[in-house]
Amino acid sequence: MSILVSGGAGYIGSHTCVELLNAGYDIVVADNYYNSCPEALKRVREITGKDFKFVEADMTDHAAVEKVFAENPGIDRVIQFAAYKAVGESVSKPIEYYSNNLNCTLNILDVMRRYDCHNIIFSSSATVYGDPASVPIREDFPVGATTNPYGTTKVFTERILTDCCKADPELNVALLRYFNPIGAHPSGKIGEDPNGIPNNLVPYIAKVAVGKLEKVHVYGNDYPTPDGTGVRDYIHVVDLARGHVAAIRKLEEKPGLFICNLGTGHGYSVLDVIHAFSKACGKELPYVIDPRRPGDIAECWCDPSKAKRELGWEAEYGIDEMCRDSWNWQSHNPDGYKTAE
């Protein structure tokens, strides 16, 4: 039996593949390389010393999803990462985001039920909570008052999966609500390598640190936070990947619907992260204050106690280790995976 990792060549997907292989699971990876590249999977093989099946496939193409299952009998679990993921871009391209992100999961669900596959772990997001009334955020907080289309696609997909779980007693679903993944594998072989100018904070800081970009743009310093910049719950991507392994085991032990935050429970501001990265790379990094971005909120950090209690999982890395590993990745791969070409 094997696990289909859709979007497995991406940032979180590739790190999760490492943890799955290290834990002894057989995997099939499907990706269309929209925001990823083959080099990431080559390096997953190098890190683990293990091979796996890869299929180049677009999850929005129903026939392509069907082919993945037909040609790989024995898939009994899916970890669904495939999605567009840039919050800012989603504001300007809502149709593309709704179409892509919903259809990826709808197609997978439709094919799963015809191939006796009854377990799916969905890559959700803290954006489902919108602008929370208070922090830390618990899983029983209201969802749906999202501030951008990306977050709304996660809300809609969660609802689809929940409804399918209610309708099909055999279907088991884990909704993992990530906070802000950063960092890279400690080997420095895989990390975040966005196409074009990064949308997320740490890849942008890293590009400044290696001289690829001039300065960090800080979007807003007038939020009601200690230093006026946005506060987020940053989580090391390796910790996050290990959370998926824990979720697989959870569904084996207790079928049904499971919803869980994956974060550290600590909030760090944009300036906190810039200072931590400066420490990691050994130089002060220039930054400029810009106006707020549409869709951004003041602060977002979680109560991670459910993950510890029910998954037996908790984050091990702090902000210094996250920035250390990001810098290790970026300094050895200044052009990302293109460095290897």
Model regions: which residues?
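Short, flexible active-site loop motifs that bind/organize anionic cofactors or intermediates
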Residues: G7, D31, V55, Q80, ...
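A general boundary/transition motif marking the beginning of the first structured unit of a protein
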Residues: R113, E192-I197, G295, E314
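C-terminal substrate-binding subdomain of Rossmann-fold SDR/epimerase-dehydratase oxidoreductases
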Residues: L201-E341
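N-terminal Rossmann-like NAD(P)+-binding domain of SDR-like oxidoreductases, especially those catalyzing
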Residues: M1-A184
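Short-chain dehydrogenase/reductase
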Residues: Y98, T147-V155, G191-N199, P203, ...
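Short, basic/glycine-rich phosphate-binding loops at helix/coil junctions
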Residues: G183-H185, D222-Y223
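Catalytic core of nucleotidyl cyclases, primarily class III adenylyl/guanylyl cyclases
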Residues: S187-K189
